[in-house]
């Protein structure tokens, strides 16, 4: 590190501007301190004089409404101050949602359900985080529903999840992932099984909307829904399905006028559709980087991070004790289906999986369902494990698991196409 980097640099920001920086180098570390004034990161206020640490992959935008001075130490690949920021439009969206919440509170009704939609790499997850943080800062307790199975913000990829937000996200680590409601999908894109994806989204919406009635504060606070970046063809159909399932009253469209106009045409006139600009700090991610991000999330699930390391367990399970299934059977023409069944019914069929070496590195979901006769699709999951070895001679698989052996009684495991190479040492 150069002398200049070790001493650090002060950045003076005017009102309604933001400091943006990116860290791409492995093992790089950047420390940020708010010297004076007021600043926030994606809606979370920075504490004065406290050091915040960011590592590889961080894409940071620290915004100030009133002006501030930030002290930054470490090597950044990109760093600049921008006065062109959509934060004022974003806070206006929060203000509009607050009006809905206040009215819902007064009339004991359900609060607003707002969906954030747009193509990949326009800042959907970031806008969700901003809206959620602003909500809890004024005393709300909203639910956060993440339908993005490609880059999950709550659970690992291949699942849809919902979590109750009770406090602002940590500047460095985001929202706590405690007690999420997670439903298994098993693919990195809705295109992996469109029928199953719609079924899982419908179930999540049903359960989430019912849960709002359990707490008056959460009921009036409503739900923020994050979505996938697939917005054309079947992807657009999935967005419409989610809007209907959740009864969305507002849809925030990021950076795509075509999608905005299609939604204006296709959703009820009672739904507020708002076109918003993306932040200039949003960075397009390559296919390789997306894969790395998925891998990192799975690694953190099993091993934690430097601030809070986890120590997972490895143990063997005999083939005969392994109750492993997959949702979705190979497609058959309608003429080959039993009377009364259609080909798409196969998409939600639960079929047994025989262990083979092809299972190595696959992530498995542990379902709360006790039998395939239960509603497996409509049953949430308890956690995940990963197959690290398959011994055909001894008829055993080796599992990486957050919990020690044995698996719970009647454990029902669900296959996913997600894979994780456990190279942790």
Curated annotation (Swiss-Prot):
Subcellular location: Nucleus
Binding site for ATP: 18, 59, 121-126
Gene Ontology molecular function terms on file: ATP binding; polynucleotide 5'-hydroxyl-kinase activity
Gene3D superfamilies tied to this protein: Clp1, DNA binding domain, P-loop containing nucleotide triphosphate hydrolases, Pre-mRNA cleavage complex subunit Clp1, C-terminal domain
Pfam families xrefs: Clp1, CLP1_N, CLP1_P
GO CC, any one term: tRNA-intron endonuclease complex
Keywords: ATP-binding, mRNA processing, Nucleotide-binding, Nucleus
Keyword Nucleus found: yes
SUPFAM superfamilies the UniProt entry points to: P-loop containing nucleoside triphosphate hydrolases (SSF52540)
A biological process term (GO) from this entry: mRNA 3'-end processing
Keyword Zinc included in the entry's annotation: no
Entry similarity comment: Belongs to the Clp1 family. Clp1 subfamily.
Function: Required for endonucleolytic cleavage during polyadenylation-dependent pre-mRNA 3'-end formation.
PANTHER family per UniProt: CLEAVAGE/POLYADENYLATION FACTOR IA SUBUNIT CLP1P, POLYRIBONUCLEOTIDE 5'-HYDROXYL-KINASE CLP1
Name listed for the protein in its UniProt record: Protein CLP1 homolog
UniProt source species: Drosophila persimilis
This protein's encoding gene: cbc
